[in-house]
Curated annotation (Swiss-Prot):
Residues 79-147 bind DNA. The keyword DNA-binding applies. Belongs to the WRKY group III family. SMART domains: WRKY. Coiled coil: none annotated. The lineage of its organism: Eukaryota, Viridiplantae, Streptophyta, Embryophyta, Tracheophyta. Its main location: nucleus. It is found in: Nucleus. Transcription factor. Interacts specifically with the W box (5'-(T)TGAC[CT]-3'), a frequently occurring elicitor-responsive cis-acting element. InterPro entries: WRKY_dom, WRKY_dom_sf, WRKY_plant. Pfam families: WRKY. Keywords: DNA-binding, Nucleus, Transcription, Transcription regulation. GO terms for cellular component: nucleus. This is Probable WRKY transcription factor 66.
């Protein structure tokens, strides 16, 4: 639009210059009596007036460019992968081919755009092949509450969530067992008595001697009964 206005202003000035040269020639040759000079004078004045007024015409600013100025770039970060962990959850909503790059540009918006009216967006563009480098350009500020975890959400790379400040509740933590030494001692004693009673009640005398020859023999050497209630007669 501004180039079009400048071209018209130049054309008007050139027209005025031509009229001024014609007027100069008439005055030089003293031909003003036979030819009217008023049209030339009016053309010169009109051309200068148009050229001066064209500079005061307001420039048209496109809505697209004004929107870009309002939503300024907040920052840029480079990463080796398109799934850059920056502490926010993003959702991909589009991609397109860029004239100045062989790689497509990916567009993301905050995952809380609808729930919390967050207008933050970002663009991901591959700027280098070997080694790969992806540039993340952030536009707008987050109006949502920043989550306590980071998210990978790079299109086909899937979505993986990592929560760094997660504390395991005490209810699911393994609890140490309380150990009562007296209780264990009583259980051991009860177990020993149970074994002895089992031997006295269910084993034959010969089998008991064959199974425990050393124990029975040792007790017999000291004049003790092998087991209370168990009579062993070896021939």
């Amino acid at each position: 639009m501004s180039l079009e206005i400048d071209a018209k202003a130049v054309s008007a000035l050139l027209l005025g210059q031509g009229c001024a040269n014609n007027l100069k020639t008439l005055l030089k040759n003293h031909e003003t009596g036979s030819v009217s000079t008023e049209p030339l004078i009016n053309s010169i004045l009109d051309s200068f007036s148009f050229a001066l007024s064209s500079q005061n015409i307001p420039r048209h600013v496109s809505q697209r460019s004004s929107k870009k100025k309002m939503c300024g770039i907040q920052g840029m970060e480079d990463s080796p992968t398109p799934a850059h962990i920056d502490g926010f959850i993003w959702r991909k909503y589009g991609q397109k081919t860029i004239k100045t790059s062989p790689h497509q540009r990916w567009y993301y918006r905050c995952a809380y755009a609808k729930d919390q009216n967050c207008d933050a967006t970002k663009r991901v563009q591959k700027i280098q092949d070997n080694p790969p480098v992806y540039r993340n350009t952030y536009v707008g500020q987050h109006a949502c509450e920043a989550p306590a975890y980071a998210v990978n959400n790079g299109g086909t790379y899937g979505s993986k969530m990592i929560k760094f400040d997660y504390v395991i509740p005490e209810s699911v933590m393994p609890q140490p067992l309380s150990i009562d030494s007296q209780e264990i001692t009583m259980e051991d004693k009860d177990t020993d008595d149970h074994i002895l009673n089992y031997i006295n009640e269910h084993l034959m005398e010969d089998e008991a001697y064959d199974v425990f020859p050393d124990v029975l023999g040792e007790r017999c050497c000291f004049g003790l009964e092998p087991f209370p209630g168990l009579n062993i007669n070896k021939s």
